A protein has these predicted regions:
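Bacterial N-terminal signal peptides that target proteins for export
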Residues: 1-8
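N-terminal soluble domains immediately following signal/targeting peptides that reside
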Residues: 21-188, 194-201
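Bacterial N-terminal signal peptides
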Residues: 9-17
Length: 203
């Protein structure tokens, strides 16, 4: 934790209020923040939550040492999470894990633009845990602070747009739902054409 060690007291202080019940595996927090001219992401939850997800996604006995466990946590994080700003995917640089009863994953964020117009966040690290709730806080210089929840209801994903200095949540429709709506529209048009043809034939 050499890189993020100097920032840990700040993050620990912020998260202490957000996740006082962090020993519950269905609760987690994600923060996007700035420190020392750089942008970072931090995810915090109970160690048991990380353990449950790793054992579910891989298998029991997938790791034998803390280092192997940390590597799997980082791999799982990179598979299950993403951040898109102004349409560009942000890279997670040098992710690290601080193990404890309350375990934290840190990553530096690459090339966050100065003028942020939109943001899409997904954090499904704990998506396999029943009733999983992730509290998200965005606190970056030059933009309003935003706080919201990621749950199974929004598929652990949120889309936001900055309008007149205020964050607006955008409805994120699932591709299957979009396909279903499109299919219904096309079917309705097709049926309408058939009825119209039938009407002409009748007269």
């Amino acid at each position: 934790m050499q890189i993020y060690g100097r920032y840990f007291p700040l993050i620990a202080l912020i998260f202490s209020g957000l996740i006082a019940q962090a020993h519950q595996p269905d609760l987690s927090s994600l923060m996007i923040y700035e420190q020392g001219g750089k942008s970072f992401l931090a995810i915090k939850s109970a160690l048991s939550a990380f353990e449950s997800e790793i054992e579910y996604s891989y298998h029991k006995g997938a790791y034998k040492t803390p280092t192997e466990f940390e590597e799997l946590v980082i791999e799982h994080f990179q598979k299950k999470s993403f951040l898109v700003v102004n349409g560009d995917t942000i890279k997670f640089l040098n992710p690290q894990v601080s193990l404890g009863h309350e375990t934290t994953l840190f990553a530096e964020l690459s090339e966050i633009p100065n003028d942020i117009e939109s943001m899409q966040i997904k954090n499904a690290i704990f998506g396999d845990i029943s009733h999983s709730i992730c509290e998200v806080i965005i606190t970056l210089n030059g933009i309003p602070q935003k706080q919201f929840l990621l749950t199974s209801e929004n598929k652990h994903e949120a889309m936001l747009r900055l309008e007149n200095g205020t964050w607006v949540m955008i409805e994120n429709e699932h591709p299957l739902f979009i396909f279903t709506k499109s299919a219904l529209i096309i079917s309705s048009i097709f049926i309408g054409i058939l009825l119209l043809i039938a009407g002409w034939a009748f007269f």
